[in-house]
């Protein structure tokens, strides 16, 4: 390998900025004479990335919003591809944001540059033909989960399982008593965390349902307490409106602090999504619920190939965690499913501990080693 190394990274959202900064630290630890170029957020810039434009310009959610910004996104991608081809980095790493980064990777690879994609899109669940595009776009896929690595191996895509950064961040044994003390919760008695999602649409579909479920559980278990971490001020206001006119609940609303809520609780009622991985890593028994618009559900039923929607079940390869979806997600059913886990959730917890240890690979270090090995093979 030459003395100096130029690495291009492109991230499109906050989670990618976190992953990218960790990867940059690990790369510099192994190769001090390194230059970073590309697109990233404040964490990546703090590690020395010269960002060609603000990462926020790529962070768009929702079909209507994407359509409104499509001309700008296409223009920025075209300009970025041209700039990176001229810069001739030793390797280019696209971090998540596949709708933007895979197109960049494909063009750069056609121009003879090495390309890596960090964080697999959900090709194993739906639109599986995207794996053909991925195979053309990147020299190496860095997968966070072992089932993703198996999928890519089966489809002839070079892949490295690197583990998940959260598995190193979250301790193998969380201190429940300390978390309760920090949140002002009593040390004794049982606590259920209600986690209806971080987006307005999710909370709109699941918030009242989760509160109804809590009231049913309280009838059966009068000493129960609840915590609900709100992802933003807007989500807190949404929940507070839902609480108006209800029977009083022993409920503590938190501003953020989802990890504290998980550390403090005994079980979780949770929306399907990345938070289920956090609940798994905190070893908290859970019931997963999800509701979407009727038309969306019918479309997804036709498109989705996976038998499960939650990460714990995908990691287990079986129905370990109850999933109540759409019309099956009623207050009665959710309460009846969650209540036994407050008495004995050991079956879930034993698996959660095993998968935590399997994912605890020091992902940034593993990813850096894989990237440098790819560069050295050139």
Swiss-Prot record:
The protein's name: Lipid-A-disaccharide synthase
Family: Belongs to the LpxB family.
Top-level EC class: transferase
GO biological process: lipid A biosynthetic process
This protein's record includes keyword Lipid biosynthesis: yes
Record's GO cellular component terms: membrane
Keyword Transferase: yes
Catalysis: reaction(s): a lipid X + a UDP-2-N,3-O-bis[(3R)-3-hydroxyacyl]-alpha-D-glucosamine = a lipid A disaccharide + UDP + H(+)
PANTHER family: LIPID-A-DISACCHARIDE SYNTHASE (PTHR30372), LIPID-A-DISACCHARIDE SYNTHASE, MITOCHONDRIAL-RELATED (PTHR30372:SF4)
Gene: lpxB
Listed HAMAP family: LpxB
Listed GO MF terms: lipid-A-disaccharide synthase activity; phospholipid binding
EC code: 2.4.1.182
Known function: Condensation of UDP-2,3-diacylglucosamine and 2,3-diacylglucosamine-1-phosphate to form lipid A disaccharide, a precursor of lipid A, a phosphorylated glycolipid that anchors the lipopolysaccharide to the outer membrane of the cell.
Signal sequence annotation: none
UniProt entry keywords in alphabetical sequence: Glycosyltransferase, Lipid A biosynthesis, Lipid biosynthesis, Lipid metabolism, Transferase
Pathways involved: Bacterial outer membrane biogenesis; LPS lipid A biosynthesis
Originating species: Pseudomonas aeruginosa (strain UCBPP-PA14)
């Amino acid at each position: 390998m030459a003395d100096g190394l130029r690495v291009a990274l492109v991230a499109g959202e906050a989670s990618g900025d976190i992953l990218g900064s960790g990867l940059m630290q690990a790369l510099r630890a192994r190769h001090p004479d390194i230059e970073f170029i590309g697109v990233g957020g404040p964490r990546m810039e703090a590690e020395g990335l010269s960002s060609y434009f603000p990462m926020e310009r790529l962070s768009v959610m929702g079909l209507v919003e994407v359509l409104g910004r499509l001309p700008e996104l296409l223009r920025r991608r075209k300009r970025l591809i041209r700039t990176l081809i001229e810069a001739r980095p030793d390797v280019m790493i696209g971090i998540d944001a596949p709708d933007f980064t895979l197109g960049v990777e494909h063009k750069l690879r056609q121009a003879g540059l090495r390309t890596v994609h960090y964080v697999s899109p959900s090709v194993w669940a739906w639109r599986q033909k995207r794996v053909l595009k991925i195979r053309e776009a990147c020299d190496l896929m860095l997968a966070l989960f072992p089932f993703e690595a198996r999928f890519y191996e089966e489809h002839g895509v070079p892949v490295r399982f690197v583990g998940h950064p959260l598995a190193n961040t979250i301790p193998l044994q969380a201190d429940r008593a300390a978390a309760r003390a920090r949140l002002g919760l009593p040390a004794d008695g049982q606590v259920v965390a209600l986690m209806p999602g971080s987006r307005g649409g999710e909370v709109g579909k699941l918030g009242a349902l989760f509160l109804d479920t809590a009231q049913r559980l309280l009838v059966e278990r009068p000493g129960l307490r609840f915590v609900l971490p709100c992802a933003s001020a807007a989500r807190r206001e949404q929940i507070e409106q839902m609480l108006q006119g209800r029977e009083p609940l022993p409920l503590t609303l938190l501003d953020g602090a989802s990890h504290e809520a998980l550390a403090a609780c005994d079980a979780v009622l949770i929306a399907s999504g990345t938070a289920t991985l956090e609940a798994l890593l905190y070893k908290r028994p859970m019931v997963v619920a999800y509701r979407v618009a009727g038309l969306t559900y019918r479309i997804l039923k036709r498109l989705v190939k996976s038998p499960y929607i939650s990460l714990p079940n995908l990691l287990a390869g079986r129905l370990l965690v109850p999933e109540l979806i759409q019309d099956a997600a009623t207050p009665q059913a959710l309460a009846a499913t969650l209540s036994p886990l407050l008495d004995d959730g050991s079956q879930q917890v034993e698996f959660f501990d095993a998968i935590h240890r399997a994912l605890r690979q020091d992902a940034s270090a593993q990813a850096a080693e894989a990237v440098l090995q790819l560069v050295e093979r050139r």
